A protein has these predicted regions:
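Sensory modules in modular signal-transduction proteins
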Residues: 66-85, 200-242
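PAS-family sensory domains
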Residues: 93-126, 188, 222-276
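Amphipathic alpha-helical "output/dimerization" segments
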Residues: 179-193
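Short loop/turn motifs at secondary-structure junctions and domain boundaries
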Residues: 75-79, 146-152, 217-219, 272-273
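Non-catalytic regulatory/interaction regions at protein termini and inter-domain linkers
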Residues: 1-54, 61, 100
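Extended hydrophobic
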Residues: 142-176
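PAS-family sensory/regulatory modules and their coupling/dimerization elements
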Residues: 142-143, 151-156, 256-296
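Regulatory sensory and allosteric helical modules in signal-transduction proteins
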Residues: 50-79, 84, 88-142
Length: 296
């Protein structure tokens, strides 16, 4: 109620510093002051049909990793009457899970998948502020401009990729009576987990691209080339090496070298001692045939 009366005084003029809410929330109040009336509720704009499907496809990696993380969190929050949400960087709600009665109450306000948490439509809200401020935000009760949200508490934290770019946000919503002290920190933990997973996927994809480029170059050389991992499993063999050693280029991938070939003693010793070999003559045995090669 104190914030409600503060809002009314703000409409009439200005608020003394002692009566202002947190700076980010107060700045939002100032932006909303000339845009809306607190008592009038305006349902959020909602992306539907092909538009919403296109947004979800564009955010497929965020959704895939986010859904797994949020579902795991919900599994251990069965007694909590709250919702966990995934939003894109524009504030469009892509997916949510959690308490069904709470979800139905939120749907009555127009918050369904595709709804935009835009400050210009619904007033001060945590997801919009989290994206704008770039850090976790919580907006509770009468800190919301719209009176329809005064019974609600929302927390949100942006999700960042390894380049520091916002990829979306994670939000938690519940009735004001059901909020808990750890709600904001929970969204922070989930957002960081999802961000780390996005970064790992990105690094893996980049490594695979570089590896494919390397393999493409090796495919074109005249010499036979093989590569294996620390366990002795074949990771790569080009067409020239497969032909020389009488191996199937595709079927040999991922198999132990010892299953494919009888390695020369000199090569086995060099592998065991981690010693390089340069232009040495060795003989492989493959399919009961001896194959003389010059090895580096």
């Amino acid at each position: 109620m104190e914030n409600t009366s503060s809002w009314q005084r703000l409409i009439e003029g200005d608020l003394p510093p002692a009566q202002r809410p947190a700076p980010a929330i107060y700045a939002s109040w100032l932006r909303c002051r000339s845009l809306m009336q607190p008592a009038v509720w305006k349902a959020p704009h909602c992306a539907l049909g092909a538009t919403f499907n296109s947004i979800c496809q564009r955010k497929n990696d965020l959704l895939t990793l986010g859904q797994a993380a949020l579902e795991d969190a919900c599994e251990y929050m069965e007694q909590r009457r709250c919702l966990l949400m995934i939003l894109d960087e524009s504030g469009c709600m892509l997916w949510l899970c959690g308490d069904i009665p709470t979800r139905e109450c939120l749907q009555l306000l127009g918050f369904t998948p595709g709804a935009y948490w835009a400050e210009g439509d619904i007033g001060t809200n945590a997801p919009s502020l989290a994206v704008a401020e770039g850090h976790p935000m919580q907006v509770r009760g009468s800190e919301h401009v719209r009176q329809a949200l005064h019974d609600w508490s929302f927390c949100a934290t942006p999700v960042y990729d390894n380049s520091g770019r916002q990829r979306g946000s994670i939000a938690l919503g519940c009735r004001l009576a059901d909020c808990a002290a750890g709600d904001l920190s929970l969204t922070l933990a989930l957002a960081r987990e999802i961000g780390n997973s996005l970064n790992a996927d990105s690094l893996l994809a980049e490594s695979n691209r570089h590896l494919n480029q390397l393999y493409g170059l090796l495919d074109g050389v005249d010499d036979g080339v093989m590569a294996w991992d620390h366990r002795g499993y074949l990771q790569y063999i080009n067409q020239r090496a497969a032909s020389l050693l009488k191996l199937d280029e595709q079927q040999s991938q991922g198999k132990a070298l010892t299953q494919l070939l009888t390695l020369p003693a000199l090569l086995n010793r060099a592998i065991a001692q981690r010693q390089p070999l340069q232009h040495v003559e060795v003989t492989f045995e493959s399919q009961r045939q001896f194959i003389a090669t010059l090895l580096t």
